[in-house]
Amino acid sequence: MKKSNFVFFSGGSPNHLYDSIHDSDFSTELHDVEKRGIIAGCSAGAMIMGEKMIKGVGLNYLPNTIVIPHYGESFYSWISSTVKLLNRGKYKLLCLEKDTYFIKDGDQLSVLGKQNVHIIYKKEHHTFTDGDTID
């Protein structure tokens, strides 16, 4: 891993991913990978990028943020509704629709994909599409 420039986390259980990674040599090395390359994830792999998850904490690559994948998909709609109620404005919600991604470069996020990324914070709801940047 010392020469890796790309790490991808797939879906599954976000809590299992976090428990397997945090406070490990792998976690320490991830920060070095971030400096020289890309850390990516989908579904649960995206959820662990935030500071907080629906249950538990994340890896904090996005401070003050909860990442919600599958946003708008009917099966997962209860998750985003529940998080909005529980959140009460403490964290930003970064909600990803299907086939849509964000790229973090420093403090800026760029949107890439077929659908939208939503940032929900308190009573504000902003929608971003392919090519948009988020400060």
Predicted features and spans:
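A short, aliphatic-rich alpha-helical micro-motif
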Residues: 1-2, 34
